[in-house]
Amino acid sequence: MFILNAIAAFGNWFWGLPILFLIVGGGIYITFRLGFVQFRHFGYICSQTFGKMFAKTGDDEISSFSVACTALASSIGASNIVGVPVAIAMGGPGAIFWVWLIALIGCATKYTEVALGVKYREKNEDGEWVGGPFYYLRGLGGGIGKFLGGFYAIGLMIELIPSLAAQGLSATSQFAIFGVNQVIVGVIIGVLIVLVVAGGLKRIGKVMDIMVPVMAVVYMVGAFIVIFANIGNLIPAIVSIFKYAFAPHAAVGGFAGSTIALALRWGAARGVYSNEAGFGTAPAAHSSADVDHPIRQACWGVFEVTVDTLIVCTVTALAVLASGVWTSEKYEAGALAQAAFNNVFGAFGDYFVAICVFLFVFSTLIACVYYGQRQAEFLFGVKFAKIWRWIYVVFMVVATTGIDLTMMYMITDGFLAAIMIPNMIGCIVLVGQIAELQKEYFNTPGKYYLADVEAKKAKKAAK
């Protein structure tokens, strides 16, 4: 118990100023080294991602969109519905400004992670592409690279145990509203997860290709209805985000008030948690893509952060702020999104939010089990990894019988801190290699970026 408390205490400390120095400072450095690529080439990035979501690929190929959906399944979770309102409740409307800023900086970090994942990927025993921090950290060279790679793999493999337990409880608890036994639901979910993951990334990709876009669109349609029902408060809500990012907010109703420091702290933490830039998890999925260059796949890293944080989180924030529920004394921080939907949809709002949270968390569980399996494979081989995924399911089902959810999240925070440190060190030190790859991608005549530009011109001329 002492060890778990120590891990939780470390996580609580880390998610203050240290996270700002590491993620924000590191992200700014990476942004400068890459020449502000997420801004300078944003139009091109959109054309290669949003513009090619439904591009056809070969039967045996794993498309960039499929792996992006798998990575999005991990980042689009309960945090998008529950975490964002908590940031508002604790840090005021200004917290959302810092969520956005972290996302803009995080685009470069995620871009770097994905590019490194593809650059350093290898073929496993089954002939599949595998990669992630546990591979690219070895690019640091010598014993330190091997140590950090192994440390990351062990850390994430263990971190996913409390994370999956907490996420599993979040998913099954949504069925309480329907009067269904949580343990039975947990067992069913566990079996479904293993059936999906057992098919490898191809099967996961096929499921996520449908599930992620549908659940995101359904949720956003509902949130937009809430926003339009409170359209008169939309502009004041947007103004408050910018105003209170740089000014304290006085207490009002059930809101206890906030300072600039609180807005920054909660906005930064939620921003990082939401898009997972700096975690190093997404490259495990992206490394499997059939793609001609690491930078082409890196564009999907920017796509992920844009969808997860700049779109989905923003819609949640505006729904909560415009509805005014965040200042009410009747609701707890974690129930603000549900309250906003209830004000418009009535009792149906409870069911709508419960279903959305379940779908978001279920997709996250699938992605996380896959990530954990990859760590186990790196450390102990393919056979052990196939057994290890069942260990995750067992812990998830046991969690449905009742666990201290707060402690699980605190332990998760501690382990996340431990794995983010080596991953960010790797990204910062190795970003020079990505800068070189970027030059190759954007400047090689007749290939990659320039070939795409010429193809676009030819298409226009043909019209």
Predicted regions and their residues:
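N-terminal alpha-helical transmembrane segments of multi-pass membrane transport
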Residues: 1-78, 88-95, 106, 398-399, ...
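Extracellular/periplasmic helix-exit of transmembrane alpha-helices
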Residues: 111-125, 224-240, 248, 252-255, ...
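Membrane-interface loop-to-helix entry segments
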Residues: 22-29, 33-46, 156, 169-175, ...
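Helix-loop-helix module between adjacent transmembrane segments
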Residues: 30-31, 102-127, 133-134, 138-197, ...
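Selective recognition of specific alpha-helical transmembrane segments in multi-pass small-molecule
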Residues: 105-113, 187-201, 212-232, 265, ...
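Transmembrane helix-loop junctions in multi-pass membrane proteins
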Residues: 2-3, 33-38, 79-84, 160-174, ...
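Alpha-helical membrane segments and immediately flanking helix-loop junctions
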Residues: 57-90, 116-119, 125-134, 138-140, ...
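Flexible loop linkers connecting adjacent transmembrane helices
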Residues: 36-63, 86-96, 108-143, 326-344, ...
